[in-house]
């Protein structure tokens, strides 16, 4: 392959990398956990990242236990998990 062809290939690969969305491999593992209200029943509006829908959704957190996929604001959820 000529040097011009290699340069074109390198440019196309670079463009592909820039335009490809961040994959789930780049997200923290906690973003893959399901929403977990926990056993308590206080009822705090919270947000979790839904990997199937690829967005942060609201749920009601009971106030104790649960898991790490639990954010006070949608913005915090998006900055941690959304690509």
Curated annotation (Swiss-Prot):
SMART domains assigned: KU (SM00131)
Principal location: secreted
Single GO MF annotation: serine-type endopeptidase inhibitor activity
Cystine pairings recorded for this chain: 31-81, 40-64, 56-77
GO cellular component assignments: extracellular space
SUPFAM superfamilies named in the record: BPTI-like (SSF57362)
Site positions for Reactive bond for trypsin: 41-42
Subcellular location: Secreted
Keyword match Repeat: no
Tissue: Expressed by the venom gland.
Domain BPTI/Kunitz inhibitor: 31-81
Keyword Disulfide bond among UniProt keywords: yes
InterPro entries, per the entry: Kunitz_BPTI, Kunitz_BPTI_sf, Prtase_inh_Kunz-CS, TFPI/VKTCI-like
Annotated signal sequence range: 1-24
Keywords: Disulfide bond, Protease inhibitor, Secreted, Serine protease inhibitor, Signal
Family label: Belongs to the venom Kunitz-type family.
Function: Serine protease inhibitor.
Protein name, per record: Kunitz-type serine protease inhibitor microlepidin-1
Source taxonomy: Eukaryota, Metazoa, Chordata, Craniata, Vertebrata
């Amino acid at each position: 392959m000529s040097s011009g062809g290699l340069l074109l290939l390198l440019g196309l690969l670079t463009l592909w990398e820039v335009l490809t969305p961040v994959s789930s491999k780049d997200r923290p593992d906690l973003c893959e956990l399901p929403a977990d209200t926990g056993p308590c029943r206080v009822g705090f509006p919270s947000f979790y990242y839904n990997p199937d829908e690829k967005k942060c959704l609201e749920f009601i957190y009971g106030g104790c236990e649960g898991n790490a996929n639990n954010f006070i604001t949608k913005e915090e959820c998006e900055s941690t998990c959304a690509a």
